[in-house]
Amino acid sequence: MSKYSQGRFVPKNPAKLIGKQEVVFRSSWELTVMNFLDNHPSVIQWASESIRIPYTNPLTGRPSQYVPDFMVLYQDKNGNRRAEVVEVKPSKEALVENAKSKRDKASLILNTAKWAAAMSWCKKNGMTFRILTESDIYITKPKKKR
C-alpha cells in the first residue's frame, strides 16, 4: 500500500485539459492543485506531466528527462495571458533549510538540477517556472507561542 494519496483525476471541465485524458495524481497536494486548475475561472488550459525537459543528473552524471507536474495557461488580473510550468514538492525536498535527512538532501540536489533546466527551458519558451510547496498550497494559521 502506498504511503501517499494517489489516483485518477476526473476533471469537471475537461475542455480546459490539454493532452492525455487520464490524469494521475501522486499526492493529495497534486490533487488539490488539479482541483484548483480545473475550477478556477482564470485558468484557460492546463496539462499534467505533458512536457519533458532534458537535464544531467548530478548524482549519476547521466543525461535524464525531467517531467514537471503541470503546465498552465491563465489570464492574470490585468487580462494578460501567462504560461507557467509548475512543480509540486514538499518543502523538505525544495528548501535547503528543511532538508534534514540524507535522503532529503539527495532529493534536493537532484531537484535543484531539474529546476535549473526547467527555468532555462521556460525562459527559452516565454514561460515561467514555479515550485509550489505545502505552504503555498495550504493556508495555515501560525502556531501560537506558549
Give residue spans per PLM region:
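Electrostatic, structured charged patches in enzyme active sites and in nucleic-acid/phosphate-binding
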Residues: 1-146
